[in-house]
């Protein structure tokens, strides 16, 4: 089990990845942190992500947060996707990090709000979705593909908040198939209250739909909570 963790205080701080293990899902043993913000590309935090397996090793994929200086001298945050390889105890960050940067996104996609990668393997390829928002402050999920987990290609905006009613940034997306139907789960920020729902601003919704694996299109139904 991996989780967001700031080991030094009970207040918000640069995120680490905590680590616990169990052989029965009931009794857990705390392990040393597996990721710490110790590189230039993630010095402001190792945000959440997901994991897969390659060649018998764990592969953690996470969002590294850093700052960049703009041409006018101002400082702006950047969120990029990074990987680390491990054996269940010790994890080493790839020298290729960050493996996905905001510069790989279309021009109208945010480089600041670009986080929480979910990875999976289909056939010989790996796929990854990341939460994002566009220049109109509407949430969306973007899709990338790779053959080796280190060189990635932008594919498409898989789903978006085209109506403007489903919040701004879409955090922590997940995408999977269940009984022939694909589901996209995400946590939109800044949702507007609707009757008895969405009164805390940050929520979780899911979309059911059909995914075309060749064209990378997702025909989604209306969101449900």
Located regions from the model:
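Short, well-structured alpha-helical interface segments that form or flank functional binding sites
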Residues: 170
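Beta-rich carbohydrate-recognition and catalytic domains
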Residues: 1-116, 120-167, 177-225
